[in-house]
Amino acid sequence: MNDTAEQTKPVLLGKIDLSKAGRNCKMYLGDLTGNGRKDLLLVQPDGGIDDRYIPHQVEAMTAFDIEGNLLWQTGTPSDDPGGPGSDYPVQIYDIDGDGYNEVLCVMDKAFFIIDGKTGEVKKQYELPNEFAHDCIVIANLTGNSYPRDIILKDRYHQLWALNHKFELLWTHKGNVGHFPWVFDFNGDGRDEVMAGYDFLNADGQLLWSCSELDDHADCIWVGKVQQQTEHNQLVIGGSVTVLYDWKGEEIWRYNGSIESQHVCLGKFRSDLPGLQIAGLDRIIRGTSYSDGRDGIFLLDADGQEIWKENRETGGWLTIIDTISDWDDSGLDYILAYRRGGNVLPTIYDGYQQVVATFPVDGYVSFDDLVGSGRKQVIVYDQTTAYIYANEFIDLSQNKLTALPQDKRSYSVTLYPGGEYVK
């Protein structure tokens, strides 16, 4: 059975002028005002650092609604900001449980909880370490009714776990990768932590580590990959792509890549059992946007290669992610952007066929912006955001209740990880 999708032209729903936010911003999406629509938070990083070794802080944040109205700004956009070479320490999440989202960020060497509606500071805390601001991970380590603990980390070596009062719970040193993923594997109401190649319990105790893997973990995904499994498994992309069970047994490894820079899980094919794993192989590291070479590949649930892209254009910095509910096909797709070589952001199906190509280049954010049940895609550059959908939808309708922030939306990272728990 061939379930390839029909290619459609994306519908432009709106354009937003982002110039007031400054250059080199990353976009975060969340309902900041509580009106049932996602808003846009543009975050500019600090400059003057080498982000291969030193983590970013926030220089400025600028919030817009999805019609382009400026909501608030904190900090002053710099004419010489840092670049997007690593994560920015920001998340949008209702950390205090009052029904409205806050913005969590590290700015001016401190951790801030900011009112999403106004941009005003609600709380401020001292960092546990001067370098503990590479990213922000929201977790449930203490058995609360909802996640309200925080994990901070430096670039590659140490992480710090704190409770909702910002009291230190524990710290861990190891090969912690880029963005640790938290998940309650054993069902005790507390999250375990996959910190790079190290698997920790909720108290920070090392239970096991991946073996014979080089470099560091770039992306981590959780899901029941194999159809016969009763338990969630871990897909880790690093020097190679591996599948582990949550107790530390390696199930398979895929050695057909040079550098497995990104992985993502999804039901990309209906003719194959279990889930499929899309990956991005960084084949030749380049020195600019459009030299070097990378390629997308797809694996089945047992780690066997289904196909691998043979790019004829340059480009080595592609980011891929799973996008669900773009249309009514019932299948997931692979969204690829930052491709280089004049290749525009594109949605692919599980047969490597193009579902949609966006007519502008840039970074990409996507979410269900108004609770419609469908995802919209925002492509943005230094000055403009373009909002696209598979078909027209009215984005102007306010609702009486706030739009909740799901885990994917409060776990934003340059190295997309995730969980597939449908």
Which functions belong to the PLM regions below?
Residues M1-K422:
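Beta-propeller-forming repeat regions
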